[in-house]
């Protein structure tokens, strides 16, 4: 009996070690987007792609084509899809619409239209002074009234300067809303745990893949790795989602748009049995995961399986490792929009880190 305390101490030590080990080895979450929302505030209304726009009649008559061309820009996939849906709104509806996710105000600090008067009352005097000094500013406010919200205010000294400011800043305004949209998608995606990072030890890169994906292909000889999300119930209401990585040695950076198209075509044929619809292909310079490279968008088809869908591929060259990468995102979703799925996959693919 005199050894009982010692035995108990040893058992407690073993249990503590085992507990710590299990805690260390248990799946983890990727928390980069956890602070996106303010959970102390009410729930937000509206769709992620709807932007409620408030502006005076004179400004609308002048800027409506620019607003629509910027925010409702399209991308050609299986068919053209819009990023956003613009809803021009009356400022008198603000009490109701203040609970919605995306609000865009366009006004001045000198004109007398209702939207400008609203902004003049709402804007801090110091910010009004900035507008007077610069003749135009863009302000953003996150989660002002509800837990998930982006408010963008485009404010000029007068209508003439306001029109110039919006026209010159149209891409920036679009990017503000797009950034918020993609982060919302990422937040939802990463509410679950991710595949353990030990999985990627044999590879020259790592990814934060949600653990509801499964391994689709692991072709080590051809340096190709692919993951697939597929819903348990196959009723057409849930998309198939693919994330794939291909890499190859490349001593000098000769990566270009042709390399991207040729490599993606080869991967589709060898790994998926697919081909690309050349009429839909679009390439552009694009920054991905901190690298300047290229993006390829379009549609894929598989006649044998009577299947098809949309894809986006990202290519870049890593100088340190002297390797070229192609990161591919692909979806099969006959009954739904492909663009939001590809935006979600982009956020997952963007977690790629080259070792």
Regions found by a protein language model. Name each.
Residues 30-37, 45, 50-58, 62, ...:
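Secretory pathway targeting signatures of secreted, lumenal, and periplasmic proteins
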Residues 161-187, 207, 213, 324-355:
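Surface-exposed amphipathic alpha-helical segments
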Residues 16-19:
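C-terminal motif of bacterial Sec signal peptides marking the signal peptidase cleavage site
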